[in-house]
Amino acid sequence: MANLFLAHRPRRMRKDTFSRRLMCEHVLTSNDLIYPVFVIEGENKTEAVQSMPGVQRQTIDLLLKTAAECVALGIPAIALFPVISPDLKSLNAKEAYNPSGLVPKAIRALKHAFPDLGVITDVALDPYTTHGQDGIIDDHGYVRNDATVSILVKQALCHAKAGADVVAPSDMMDGRIGAIRSALEQHTYIHTRILAYSAKYASAFYGPFRDAVGSSANLGKSNKYNYQMDPANSDEAMKEVALDIEEGADMVMVKPGMPYLDVVRRVKETFGVPTYAYQVSGEYAMLKAAAQNGWLDEQACVMESLLGFKRAGADGILTYFAMDVARWLK
């Protein structure tokens, strides 16, 4: 075999650990992680989420123990998602802005115990409506945009008053970021940040989450196509992100994560703003199921998937693996 002269041998730099480390372009750390948690009423109680192995709904007292672990592991923030009792759900979602409700109670407890832990709250009505939609509906089941926004503003103010560091509207109503920002300013909550779910797709990967918060049965066979985005579109995402930034969002989100990393990349390159991605319940469930069946190495695949988020441009990642990942990184 003739000797080949190769001016370029990229494999040279991949030969040893030290040189691979020196040219590593992206690094995942605990600073990149946000831990989503499901909170329920009561005391000293947990409920397993069957479609999300390893994930539990938990009462506020147990949530404080989880938060303590997050702090010890260096996780900067948690995201609260409430499981609302069926008897508190209504057509007008009045419980969403109850100052004595589950979310405000959880916020106050968390901020009292862990003032430096970031608390992010979900601003959306689907946990509170009897029909499982993210807003107020008309007689035909269509979500009324402006009527919904007025409720979302009340909800965001309720969370801010309780001490939330970040309110995160996930509803995809038009104009809600501007309305919430204006209300926060008027009520002197000038430091309350807005994480806008700017590009939230009408995805099939949300199923286990809806089980977790108890909205799946309410939604039934209905869908959210008239406000969440078509998975076929990415130009539309750019428009949505631009509008949210203009209206006062501090951070923007792409959801789901892995199937939409091209959108994450476009958002980061186009706008250069803090950009977040959500490794949603369906993504979590797929990886968990494959690992439990011995088909995949859980740690290796989770770490690779999250590194892909970072490579695409995500500044932070909401993932149900956050605590596991933080431990692995130790």
Please state what every model-predicted region is.
Residues 19:
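N-terminal [4Fe-4S]-dependent radical SAM core
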Residues 24-25:
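Charged, low-hydrophobicity low-complexity segments
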Residues 2-4, 8, 16, 28-34, ...:
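Alpha/beta enzyme core
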